[in-house]
């Protein structure tokens, strides 16, 4: 978990405001996020769905029928996974992972005013290296079945 730097520039929190197409700000990052948030909320209100990233846990924080999961793995495991998918050296894979995680963290902090890797933001945190991808998915499925008393 990272410690917030109080000298970082202030972050913005999602308000749900949508900017209309005729506005000069329509193509802003802020407006793109707001439209993504609207779509995420609309989907979650209408049907069961799995949303990876995009601050979905924060956007849906006031909904009862949601499971917020943070799936992670030690950097050594992430490096192995990246190297299995791409022809990168260990150093290159680690650099790529750090860059992606930095972007994820900054994006999450900017729109939610929270820390991406803070376990308190999620009801379920899982180290995927312990069970592997398939068993981790089964674990999450079992959790959903127990929480909502349903059979998937």
Features from the language model and the residues they span:
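Residue-level signature of catalytic and energy-coupling elements of molecular machines
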Residues: 50, 78, 126
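Short, amphipathic alpha-helical "lid/cap" segments that border enzyme active or binding sites
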Residues: 37, 133-141
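Conserved phosphate-donor/acceptor-positioning beta-strand/loop module used by diverse small-molecule
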Residues: 62-86, 90-98
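ATP-dependent small-molecule kinase phosphotransfer cores
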Residues: 1-48
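C-terminal helical "lid" subdomain and adjoining coupling/linker elements of P-loop NTPases
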Residues: 147-152
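RNA pseudouridine synthases
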Residues: 43-46, 56-62
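Small-molecule kinase domains that catalyze NTP-dependent phosphoryl transfer to phosphate-bearing small molecules
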Residues: 1-16, 89-134
């Amino acid at each position: 978990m990272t410690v917030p730097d109080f000298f970082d520039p202030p972050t913005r929190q999602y308000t749900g405001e949508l900017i209309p197409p005729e506005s000069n700000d329509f193509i802003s990052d802020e407006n793109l996020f707001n439209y993504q948030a609207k779509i995420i909320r609309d989907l979650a209100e209408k049907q069961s769905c799995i949303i990876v990233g995009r601050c979905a846990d924060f956007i849906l924080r006031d909904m009862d029928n949601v499971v917020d999961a943070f799936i992670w793995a030690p950097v050594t495991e992430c490096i192995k996974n990246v190297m299995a998918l791409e022809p990168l050296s260990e150093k290159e894979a680690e650099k790529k992972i750090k860059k992606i995680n930095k972007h994820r963290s900054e994006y999450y902090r900017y729109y939610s005013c929270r820390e991406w890797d803070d376990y308190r933001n999620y009801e379920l945190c899982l180290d995927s290296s312990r069970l592997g991808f398939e068993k981790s998915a089964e674990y999450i499925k079992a959790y959903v079945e127990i929480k909502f008393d349903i059979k998937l």
